[in-house]
């Protein structure tokens, strides 16, 4: 009898544990819902579906919306589908933007059933951690991770906090505190340090930063894993401090190629993987990282990103890959190597077919995952015999430097992706996005990621639904605007970097070509007109639409006026020159005012968030300088690469440069003398350096109108002002 009682208890315990395990995903999905819509928690019910294949279902049962999924990630995707297509709402990836849905939840007619077309959905780029995320706290990360889950992402790049791991490794190797922290760059530059592009720039990195990032990464990884994601952590790819040569003089350490015009003092060093020291460092790093962060056995290793390897000999490259992989599996037998393929595109003349094959086949089959990084431009799977059968992920990049240009051949990219899913081979394992920054419209990434699921939504319906959820209702004028954007404006492969106001002024320089567009600005003006006919600007997504389209129209028009200004310089027409100059200044002023209507279109948030990272006035100033530096002068030859169309930055930085340029040429033409170009450039550089090193700025928030119709009124006013001027 006693044995029977024990047996019964054991069975009940096992059943209880099984039930708990089954319900864990439901609890996670409910917690996500509570974070987004706490008032609606009783209106939804989540159910666990059987099966390994990612899938979700949505149906109405009595007075509840019932969402099923095989795991919490699939349930989140199902929740987002309901919010998008039934509640007409867009969940922002920004933490401060509330989710707006109808008071009475719409019922679901026919049951929705969807299954994933690919197993892996990847997101992020090393650069995103510099251009968008360096000052993020847990609040920002929590919303962003929820956004990733809502869009079905299950393999995010997760590189926060790795400097703390490296600090432990280099300390054990015999380096001093100041040597190690001086080897690191300033916070927003860490992505390029991690990719072995630059060392030491804006260092030394404060110890407080390292400690903060460890705490943050633990929260990030816990939440990502909770939502059924497999974070991609870093591994050792050969990048070592120059000071290591002092401790290990016999080590095979060589210089990597120079990068982006940086001086030799910032050049990176590479340890040959066949040196015994390489395996030692790899094991130290992975062991220390596992202690802090655990592992999902997928590691990002990216040697030679935008820099030349010590040799391009195929046998050398094959051996490098083979030796590097051997050190990885010696430390973690389950390891898989994830490699971005940007270098094959960026240095396509150097990375010949033979060289690419050598690197890719140096790793055993199915042990290297390739990110086909920039597929909207070049699909490398077509040039590499399907990556020589190694697994790969088709990725849409869509943005460089985090600037907000309306660019990206979105519709064409969708067609390319559909073709890849049919003809890309059995080793196409996933879909992803590798955007450099988030200061862009969300919709291209939502569009691409949704194609990972068999939802059978055609482009016309998709764009109509997008328009509806941005404005919060069915508005024909907004639908027309979005159809034009999708079919006629978003047709250009991402190559432009912002608009001309964000570039250092120069007479007849190629910056005009870099900011030009294939569409007519008159077409975009018509989009703006239709948006201004919307019934309301209450929804945040629509407010961003108004600002983004409006500032692009003004930015494009500024280019036209500037080219006219340069022609008047050559014609020596003083009166016409003055008129053009005043017009340019006026456009810049209007741009600043338009951007001031949204906190994410303002310099204030970027600087405030940077300063909040510091616990002392000195640290606050240090972080602010780094924040100012990245979005302006950057470093090396990358001046203005990360330009932003932000209120405050336009008035206090870009406009100041343009005023000097305009006034200098007006004065010179009026006096009948030539402009000293060297002196002009020196004056502009003085403005730039002074601004980067300053800690005072205009508070643009006092200019922001908080009324719900303020932006729409101002946008309509600007449209009326410029509609007859834009050609």
Question: For the regions a protein language model found, what residue spans apply to each?
Answer:
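C-terminal substrate/ligand-recognition segments
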Residues: 514-535, 547-570
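Bacterial N-terminal signal peptides that target proteins for export
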Residues: 1-8
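Catalytic-core regions of glycoside hydrolase
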Residues: 41, 89-90, 96-105, 124-128, ...
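Hydrophobic h-region of N-terminal signal peptides that target proteins for export
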Residues: 12-20
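Contiguous, structured surface segment used for ligand recognition
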Residues: 21-118
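Active-site-adjacent substrate/metal-binding segments within catalytic domains
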Residues: 118-137, 148
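Second-shell loop/turn segments in exported
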Residues: 64-69, 130-134, 207, 312-313
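C-terminal amphipathic alpha-helical interaction region
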Residues: 561, 566, 577-727
